[in-house]
Design a protein with these regions (language model features):
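Bacterial N-terminal signal peptides that target proteins for export
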Residues: 1-9
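Short, surface-exposed ligand-recognition loops at beta-strand->loop->(often short) alpha-helix junctions
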Residues: 38-50, 147-159
Length: 241
């Protein structure tokens, strides 16, 4: 079994480095991303959710460099996840109409207001690999997983995640979008969306999840249970651009 895992990881590494002959892994080459989880102020969950739903058309109209934008909800936490064509597009987004409107309304809608409730929760990242979105607007549920590399293992974890996008594209038709992210030298994340919970269940029983689970004790701080599973956060999707 271990030999099979090592052989598969070797194949993944080859995929990650052979960029000219595997076009699908470059679907978001040089793209950036951002994730912000924001606690709603007391009594403002519904109002905050409505605000985010109303923001989606504005993002579409005013931010051509924002490739994807998702408004998300997990009970009293609202979140935004977005993908940008480059760093400049991300900067434009944060100085745009929607960011300005959120700034103006943050004191009322967000626990902690703009600085403590929004800015302090921004996680910017670079895209390592992705499965290009399909049937985007049929998605109803999303998952975000934060992952910290074990000491000295960030490079190997980055290699695995970089190679995983094409595998998801080849083997997971129910995963409608999947992206691996690097936040900083040691921290990574995965974001994916599904039409329903059956798609998520299939994903977590899939090949990439199996490879990550097999290597988590070596590559991930806390291993599989404490370093991956404990950091899984599921969301309902409120709106998509």
């Amino acid at each position: 079994m271990k030999t099979q895992i090592l052989s598969r990881l070797t194949a993944l590494a080859l995929i990650a480095t052979t960029t000219t002959s595997h076009a699908q892994e470059n679907v978001m080459d040089n793209y950036t991303a951002s994730y912000i989880a924001m606690p709603a102020a007391d009594g403002q969950i519904e109002a905050f959710a409505e605000f985010l739903v109303g923001a989606a058309p504005l993002v579409k109209e005013t931010e051509p460099g924002t490739e994807l934008w998702f408004a998300l909800q997990d009970n009293d936490t609202l979140a935004i996840f977005d993908v940008f064509v480059d760093e400049g597009a991300r900067n434009t987004h944060f100085s745009g109409v929607v960011a300005g409107a959120l700034n103006e309304n943050a004191d009322a809608l967000v626990a902690g207001g703009w600085d403590a409730g929004v800015v302090a929760n921004i996680n910017n990242s670079n895209v390592l690999s992705a499965k290009a979105p399909v049937d985007l607007y049929s998605a109803t549920t999303a998952t975000y997983i934060s992952i910290e590399a074990a000491p000295g293992k960030a490079g190997e974890l980055a290699t695995l995640l970089t190679a995983a996008g094409p595998i998801v594209a080849e083997t997971e038709p129910k995963t409608l979008f999947w992206v691996a992210l690097q936040i900083d030298e040691h921290n990574f994340a995965i974001y994916d969306i599904f039409a329903d919970n059956s798609g998520r269940k299939t994903h977590f029983a899939g090949e990439v999840a199996g490879l990550l689970k097999a290597q988590a004790s070596d590559l991930v701080k806390g291993g599989w249970e404490d370093g991956v599973v404990a950091n899984v956060r599921n969301f309902d999707i409120l709106a998509i651009k």
